[in-house]
Amino acid sequence: LMQKGSSGAALLAIDGTVIGIHVGKFGVSIVAQTLPNSTKWSDILYAKKVEDYVKKRTDIFVPISKMENQSESIFSLNLSHYPKELQDRLTDFTVYDDHEYSKKYLDGLNAVKIGNIPQVKFRPRGTLVVDGELVELCENNAIEDGEYGITVGNLDVIYKDARKYATPQREDYDEELLIKAIKFVRKQFSFLYGTPFVPPEIVLRRIRRQTSPGGLWTLLCSTKGQVIEKYAPMLYKYMKDILEGKPIPTIMVSSAWKEELRLLEKILDGKVRTMVPVPIEVVCSFQMVFGNMMDIISNHDFRITKMAVGFSPYFGGWDALEHSFDGFDKYVETDISKYDSHVRNNIKTLMFNHFWSTFFVTPYEETIAWNVYSSLYHVQFLLPDGNVLYFPDGGRWSGEPLTACENSLINYVLFVYACHKQGFSDEYILNDTQCIFMGDDARCGFRRETTFSFDSWMDAYEQCGFPVGETQKKFLERFDVSFCSLKTLPRQYLGRYVFVPIDTKMLSSLR
């Protein structure tokens, strides 16, 4: 059954499940999820059952007797895994260009200034573009917040954003209690045990339709598909070398501003976001090791995983998400500022040791997984002016394949950690709370007259190095609470109430 909702979005009813589908310029989206362009409903609604997916690993790779760890210096420029035309084009690091922006935002902080690659410099553009057509489009879609503009970054924005990775943060958490929280979350994901690696040739098929190739590849190609067309054998060899236990070359990530539609008042306040895309070889290695796990999580029932990553319509989408909060009396929401930059290496190590590593069947697989996982601990951070930095504490880079999954998992862990710190049992967490996480966003419901302290939860974030800032600090009514900036609107459809998101804030769908 297909018909239009009042917003113009298609409402598709299958076996009593109602799903809102928005078709925009850049593809098809279900609620907040963007899927690749497609004309087949079977592709849009594709989801696999994973209950029977857990199977014993068949070892198709030759075991390696001795594993080597990454040993290259962060202060050298290794281009051995890049094409010869790029190697000939670039020289090694020269003296770091310590200009006004670098001194203003990085001096005295935990950032090592490595050097400069003059060949990657490009001229910064302006700071603000107001597009009249987009303003009109917003007005036509009943967005009443005023004028909008397209954000365009500059060096000031870039260095200000880099500063967050160099800022020391509070870390006085109870490690034993945090590990206990990770193990609690791990139990909910036992279905991941025995998940096999993805063969290299399948990896290249999966990522072919993705966009920026990241890192130094942007000097040669504009999309991952172009890199694969020209240099697939190099990428294939890169993955096979990893499977043979060879050291992973030092990785270079590149910082760039993100052009997007934002409220004019936010742009004028300097709220312009940046991205740090990882190079295509990193996407390949992580997809090879963790790709199947990420697929399983994305297609699993979010009432078990507590994660809206992928948000498979197989489990009912937004309507089912809202119904999962039926019977709860108090609600809270969080949205942690600059979340990615505060996911430091020590937290990631705990996550690998007590979560990811437990799902690999053989020591060989676990070692390969650790080599890939830790390859992003010590990266070279390339800025648009050619300067290269190193942040000893690490961080989360926006283009990491694991970002959505692991950030959501860490958010879940921090909630459980806060519950344990307040003396709540595992049974209380399972039976008297309901949560949903998507990256840094969280929405939680509590049953009955709970004594759960929101301030204590926020202090748990602070202890683990996540500054809370202006996060909401009180209980809310059911339809006042939001998730990923979306609030819920109950609507009648075919004689019953259907919960849909109020999507006037979903500006990305307008472009």
List each language-model region with its residue ranges.
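Active-site scaffold segments
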Residues: 19-20, 30-34
